[in-house]
């Protein structure tokens, strides 16, 4: 059976150790992990100075678990955007977005031009965008998402909690992973 784009949108994210709940997460992080609202809005309301710092953008190979979740071939490339979400000058969240290249020609075509604007604003302002699967897990040095977060932010912890959401627009999935950095829980 050949999967359609809508099938990929429905199934993405529910694999590779990603779970639909955060029961094992520290109590202080559970609300952040499970909140289905805009992370951008939540960070803006918590910090006086909220900014987006782009650290990587362009065509790249998705992480292995992302290719599977998006229904891409293992050797396929995608558009990748990595940013740090800063609150009062400190990196609070590392965000990693992956979009199949074919989707850049459709409704997602503005993603490549976001620059320092938050992706969350575009996602939650567009009525046709649907948030589907939202999963979470603890990532450590064995997971490339942890390594990417550590490369761009000062992280001493051996593991971090992350959540991953699939947003769908016109049948095209966009995978957004957010790694919650230790500074999120500090003033």
From Swiss-Prot:
Biological-process GO terms, alphabetical: pyruvate biosynthetic process; ubiquinone biosynthetic process
Predominant location category: cytoplasm
Location(s) in or outside the cell: Cytoplasm
A Gene Ontology cellular-component term: cytosol
Pathway entry: Cofactor biosynthesis; ubiquinone biosynthesis
One Pfam family from the record: Chor_lyase
Residues annotated as binding substrate: 81, 119, 178
InterPro entries tied to this protein: Chorismate--pyruvate_lyase, Chorismate_lyase_/UTRA_dom_sf
Taxonomic superkingdom: Bacteria
The reaction(s) this protein catalyses: chorismate = 4-hydroxybenzoate + pyruvate
EC number(s) on file: 4.1.3.40
Protein family (similarity comment): Belongs to the UbiC family.
PANTHER family membership: CHORISMATE PYRUVATE-LYASE
Name of the molecule in the record: Probable chorismate pyruvate-lyase
Species of the source: Thiobacillus denitrificans (strain ATCC 25259 / T1)
Lineage, highest ranks first: Bacteria, Pseudomonadati, Pseudomonadota, Betaproteobacteria, Nitrosomonadales
């Amino acid at each position: 059976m050949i999967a359609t784009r809508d099938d990929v949108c429905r199934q993405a994210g529910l694999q590779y150790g990603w779970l639909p709940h955060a029961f094992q997460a520290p109590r202080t992080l559970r609300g952040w992990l499970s909140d289905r609202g805009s992370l951008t809005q939540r960070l803006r309301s918590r910090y006086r100075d909220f900014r987006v710092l782009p650290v990587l953008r362009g065509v790249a190979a998705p992480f292995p678990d992302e290719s599977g979740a998006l229904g891409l071939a293992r050797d396929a490339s995608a558009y990748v955007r990595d940013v740090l979400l800063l609150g009062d000058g400190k990196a609070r969240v590392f965000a990693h977005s992956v979009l199949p290249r074919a989707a850049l020609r459709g409704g997602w075509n503005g993603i490549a031009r976001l620059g320092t604007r938050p992706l969350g604003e575009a996602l939650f302002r567009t009525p046709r965008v649907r948030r589907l699967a939202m999963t979470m897990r603890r990532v450590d040095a064995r997971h490339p998402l942890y390594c990417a977060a550590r490369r761009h932010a000062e992280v001493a912890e051996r593991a971090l909690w992350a959540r991953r959401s699939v947003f769908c627009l016109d049948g095209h999935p966009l995978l957004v992973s957010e790694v919650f950095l230790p500074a999120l829980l500090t003033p």
